[in-house]
């Protein structure tokens, strides 16, 4: 039997890690030889989740082609967000809830993408469709992913399907959604001990009409916890622009209590962000009123504006 590695995107978040673990558990129950791995360091929220449900973190890998010939992707499909040597392996399956871009294969594959708030919402359906029982630990991880990606159902990405899935998983995991959810989000929003690099850890790269764009996001309970370190943040952002040849680096600082964000923009295409939102950056900073979702409120809007 051919071994498969399953993983989410670089700079992994809670959905990416928990989806990889959950997908692997589903496939193992069906007899597959599969291992969940990760492409980057864990953030504080994900660490809290794994500790809470006593789950083991997936193994960190730098490349995959040196280990296997087949992989499965969760929570992403765009090649620049995936393993560096993704073109050297065969992608046999994708389970995702994002746009499809910069992705093609030579052979047919299992591809499941749905416009829901979280990958594990889709995975819950797959467990049920295949009549595979979900353990308390895996249910807790899947629930945590939904809470994380939907900001406890406050994000515009959240659907009724996500809410129903969360309720079902909470019963199995034996937790109160609101109590656990706030505890989890606050653990992830504590930036007091984070390095500048860790503040920018949740970053994704996109190709927008030939422009190289990176968008980072962090959730906080007080934006000043990040803005007080703005000079350090901007210095690292500027270095990333130079090192990666970025046209735009946008950092979205989201207040999970007010559901608003502050944007910091570095790069030659900052004017595109200004046009997209009708704002003006002053010293690289501007308010993003009501913006909490990179997937739904940032990426599509910037993609459309770059295409003009």
UniProtKB/Swiss-Prot annotation:
EC number: 3.6.1.1
GO molecular function, one term: inorganic diphosphate phosphatase activity
Residues that bind Mn(2+) 2: 15, 75, 97, 149
SUPFAM superfamilies: DHH phosphoesterases
Top-rank EC class of the record's enzyme: hydrolase
Record family assignment: Belongs to the PPase class C family.
Name of the molecule in the record: Probable manganese-dependent inorganic pyrophosphatase
Organism of origin: Listeria welshimeri serovar 6b (strain ATCC 35897 / DSM 20650 / CCUG 15529 / CIP 8149 / NCTC 11857 / SLCC 5334 / V8)
């Amino acid at each position: 039997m051919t071994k498969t590695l399953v993983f989410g995107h670089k700079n992994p978040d809670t959905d990416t890690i928990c989806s990889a673990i959950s997908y692997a558990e589903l496939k193992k129950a069906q007899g597959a030889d599969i291992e969940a791995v990760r492409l980057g360091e864990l953030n504080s929220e994900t660490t809290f989740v794994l500790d809470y449900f006593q789950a083991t973190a997936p193994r960190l890998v730098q490349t995959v082609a040196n280990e296997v010939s087949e992989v499965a992707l969760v929570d992403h499909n765009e090649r620049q967000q995936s393993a560096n040597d993704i073109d050297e392996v065969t992608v046999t399956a994708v389970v995702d809830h994002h746009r499809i871009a910069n992705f093609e294969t030579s052979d047919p594959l299992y591809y499941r993408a749905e416009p829901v708030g979280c990958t594990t919402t889709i995975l819950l359906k797959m467990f049920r469709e295949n009549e595979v029982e979900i353990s308390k630990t895996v249910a807790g991880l899947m629930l945590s992913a939904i809470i994380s990606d939907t900001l406890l159902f406050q994000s515009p990405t959240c659907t009724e399907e996500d809410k129903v899935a969360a309720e079902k998983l909470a019963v199995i995991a034996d937790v109160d959604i609101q109590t656990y959810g706030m505890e989890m989000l606050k653990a992830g929003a504590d930036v007091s001990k984070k390095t500048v690099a860790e503040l920018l850890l949740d970053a994704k790269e996109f190709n927008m009409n030939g422009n190289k764009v990176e968008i980072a996001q962090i959730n906080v309970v007080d934006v000043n916890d990040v803005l007080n370190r703005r000079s350090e943040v901007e210095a690292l952002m500027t270095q990333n622009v130079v090192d990666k040849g970025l046209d735009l680096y946008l950092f979205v600082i989201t207040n999970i209590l007010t559901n608003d964000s502050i944007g910091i923009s570095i790069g030659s295409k900052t004017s595109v962000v200004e046009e997209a939102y009708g704002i003006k950056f002053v010293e690289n900073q501007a308010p993003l009123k009501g913006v909490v979702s990179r997937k739904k409120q940032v990426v599509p809007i910037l993609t459309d504006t770059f295409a003009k």
